[in-house]
């Protein structure tokens, strides 16, 4: 991909291996015209060495296929990862909650919730042991991810189940992470400290007036002040505390409020980031921003408000853009996420799922578990495991496939998912815009 960054330079971006190089105007024009003989020999050799150019189309195809084959093998070696839902009950009533897209049981957990937590831990151990036997390896417990979410995990009725999970995970050498709204954290703080929980995500949707119109209690009360108190408490011991701002048409302008940037700067060790919502509750999209326009708006606000420099902006394609400017390494994706590999989601009702978007929906169930054991229906699981860019016709023809990994399946129906349909980000617009923006704003450290 050739991206003009000014009148005399372009960045040549390899969409397979992530290599990026600044080229001058003569080379840019030669590449655009397909007349590679006009490129100086030394520079041409560099382009060949870095896999931009090949002697023929068969050599190019062979290289891409070898990369994809390696990625498939690597994906099969990924350690199992787990999500547990102690209940679907929540103390908030956010209009955009994706769990509102379908009906499921939001009643408070009963006395059986601890038994379900214990059954989950048993299943986790069995799955890990089976993986180790199949791959003839011994996993480091630190490489096994367990995320506890909901609903809302930190409601009073979940306390016993959370304690059971923390004890069980510690016995296995695992420290779980949590996704929470942060509203009712205080009673849980002592056990979170005791068990060394350091990875927690909270959501805060803009300045206080806007947040308090979006993330409200069931009674309609605002939650901003209470969540900020939770951030303050967690900042004392949670080393990987992140605060997500779900950006929509409703709240994006509010990040320009000076009080919001002041809040961000009060907690320099906390990772605050913008995430552009893809859909709202019941699959509505009336407040969903076009991602490119959202990026432009967010960056304009950030440029005008210097105090917002610590606010990160998440976007599709950042996995290849950020490494160009020295932030991390590009990791091509043969599939979208861990749901296409060894991720399993367990809920307190005894059901097992693969994808976050399907949890709580029986139509997306792939197995069940209890104190007697667990069972995974391989036929129901297979569409996930088989979904790779090499097996989706549209993806196999797309040059962005190893950036995207086939796209998120969460918004697809089960039938569309099985048919290999896709929902594609606008990489054709987003990548040039972000590369150009970062280069022109001074992060011109593209690898040469």
Give the residues covered by each predicted segment.
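N-terminal [4Fe-4S]-dependent radical SAM core
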Residues: 2-22, 41-83, 137-139
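Flexible mid-to-C-terminal extensions adjoining Fe-S/redox cofactors in radical SAM and related proteins
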Residues: 7, 357-448
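Short loop/turn microsegments at loop-to-beta-strand junctions
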Residues: 8, 339-342
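Canonical Radical SAM [4Fe-4S] cluster-binding loop centered on the CxxxCxxC motif
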Residues: 76-122
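Cysteine-centered iron-sulfur cluster-binding motifs in ferredoxin-type domains/subunits
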Residues: 86-93, 340, 395-397, 401-402
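Short glycine-enriched, charge-decorated loop/helix-capping segments at active-site entrances
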Residues: 109-114, 213-221, 414-415
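Radical SAM/AdoMet-radical enzyme domain recognition
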Residues: 120-149, 156-277
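Radical SAM enzyme [4Fe-4S]-AdoMet core and its adjacent flexible, acidic
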Residues: 213-339, 348, 362-364
């Amino acid at each position: 991909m050739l991206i003009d960054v000014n009148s005399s330079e372009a960045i040549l971006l390899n969409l397979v291996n992530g290599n990026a190089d600044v080229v001058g105007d003569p080379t840019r024009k030669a590449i655009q015209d397909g007349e590679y003989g006009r490129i100086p020999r030394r520079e041409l050799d560099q382009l060949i060495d870095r896999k931009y150019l090949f002697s023929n189309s068969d050599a190019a195809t062979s290289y891409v296929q070898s990369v994809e084959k390696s990625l498939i093998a690597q994906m099969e070696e990924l350690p199992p990862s787990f999500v547990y839902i102690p209940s679907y009950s929540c103390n908030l009533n956010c209009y955009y909650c994706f769990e509102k897209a379908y009906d499921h049981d939001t009643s408070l957990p009963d006395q059986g919730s601890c038994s379900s937590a214990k059954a989950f831990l048993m299943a986790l151990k069995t799955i890990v042991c089976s993986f180790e036997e199949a791959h003839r390896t011994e996993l480091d417990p630190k490489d096994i991810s367990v995320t506890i979410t909901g609903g809302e995990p930190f409601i009073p009725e979940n306390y016993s189940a959370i304690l059971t999970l923390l004890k069980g995970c510690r016995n296995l050498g695992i420290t779980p992470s949590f996704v929470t709204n942060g509203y009712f954290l205080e009673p849980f703080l002592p056990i979170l400290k005791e068990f060394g929980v350091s990875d927690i995500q909270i959501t805060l949707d803009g300045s206080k007036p806007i947040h308090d119109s979006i993330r409200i209690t069931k009674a309609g009360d605002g939650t901003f002040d209470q969540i900020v108190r939770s951030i303050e408490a967690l900042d004392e011991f949670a080393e990987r505390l992140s605060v997500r701002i779900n950006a929509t048409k409703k709240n994006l302008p509010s990040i320009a409020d000076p009080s919001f940037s002041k809040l961000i700067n009060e907690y320099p060790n906390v990772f605050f980031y913008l995430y552009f919502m893809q859909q709202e509750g019941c699959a509505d999209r009336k407040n969903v921003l076009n991602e490119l326009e959202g990026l432009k708006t967010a960056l304009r606000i950030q440029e005008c408000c210097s105090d917002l420099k610590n606010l990160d902006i998440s976007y599709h394609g950042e996995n290849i853009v950020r490494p160009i400017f020295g932030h991390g390494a590009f990791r091509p994706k043969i599939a979208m996420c861990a749901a296409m590999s060894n991720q399993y989601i367990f809920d307190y009702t005894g059901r097992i799922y693969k994808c976050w978007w399907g949890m709580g929906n029986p139509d997306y169930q792939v197995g069940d578990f209890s104190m007697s054991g667990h069972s995974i229906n391989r036929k129901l699981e297979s569409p996930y495991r088989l979904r790779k860019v090499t097996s989706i016709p549209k993806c196999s023809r797309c040059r962005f496939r190893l950036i995207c990994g086939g796209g998120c399946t969460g918004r697809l129906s089960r039938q569309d998912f099985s048919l290999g349909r896709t929902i594609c980000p606008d990489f054709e617009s987003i990548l040039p815009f972000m590369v150009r923006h970062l280069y022109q704003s001074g992060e011109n450290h593209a690898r040469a």
